[in-house]
Regions:
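Non-cytosolic coordination micro-motifs
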Residues: 36-79, 103-210
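N-terminal compositionally biased, intrinsically disordered segments and leader/signal-like regions
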Residues: 7, 30-33
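Sec-dependent N-terminal signal peptides
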Residues: 19-31
Length: 210
């Protein structure tokens, strides 16, 4: 996949901007931010952590779209095309459920897009996180996660990075915005993630799962 940082046409840039401005409307479906005391109050395309994937997908559809990018199998990732949910905001939706859970309870849900220019991802990441900071500035029990860049352990060459910022709830769950910048050593497009994660899944991510 190309990692070229070439100029994106004006129309593509405007589309990219509209997608991520609309992200905030999609995620935050509460009447007021002051009611946002539980990570389960937030949704992506009408779905959230704690829901069963079976409410939205058949078991066959789930099994047909399982991914394999964790080095252990505590959680199972599933990628579904955004168009399946009639999404105009995300190219893919990622779910994570616990291995062996026949109810397919969602522990993490993300909306994904694949920016052609990683710098556009960084710009939109800052805008979204600034909006979130303002929206929840007076809400107790929420801690800001400043933007930081890390090496992505999926790339053993050490050339790939992910940049993350977000909000951490006192219950341990988190809302994060990530830009994944993959090197040519990794057969993957660059990614922008908007994620809702439970405390348990956040702990899993911090355990170097790749």
């Amino acid at each position: 996949y190309s990692k070229s940082l070439t100029h994106i046409g004006h129309s593509e840039k405007m589309l990219f901007m509209r997608l991520f401005i609309a992200v905030l409307i999609l995620i935050f479906t509460l009447p007021t931010p002051s009611q946002a005391d539980d990570i389960r109050d937030f949704q992506i395309e009408g779905m959230s952590v704690g829901d069963s994937m079976l409410d939205f997908l058949s078991e066959e559809k789930i099994k047909d779209n399982i991914q394999d990018f964790y080095k252990n199998n505590e959680f199972i990732p599933v990628w579904i095309e955004g168009s399946y949910f009639k999404s105009t905001m995300y190219e893919k939706i990622e779910f994570n459920y616990k291995n062996g859970d026949k109810n397919y309870i969602i522990y993490s849900i993300s909306g994904l897009n694949f920016p052609k220019n990683i710098n556009d991802c960084y710009e939109k990441q800052i805008e979204i996180l600034n909006d979130l900071d303002e929206m929840f500035a007076d809400v107790k029990g929420i801690q800001k996660m400043n933007i930081e860049k890390y090496r992505h352990t999926i790339d053993k060459s050490g050339k790939s990075t992910f940049t993350r910022g977000g909000l951490i709830f006192d219950t341990g769950g988190a809302i994060t915005v990530d830009c994944n910048d993959f090197s040519n050593e990794v057969e993957s497009k660059d990614e922008m993630y908007i994620s809702i994660d439970t405390k348990e899944f956040t702990k899993f991510l911090n355990s170097d799962p790749y």
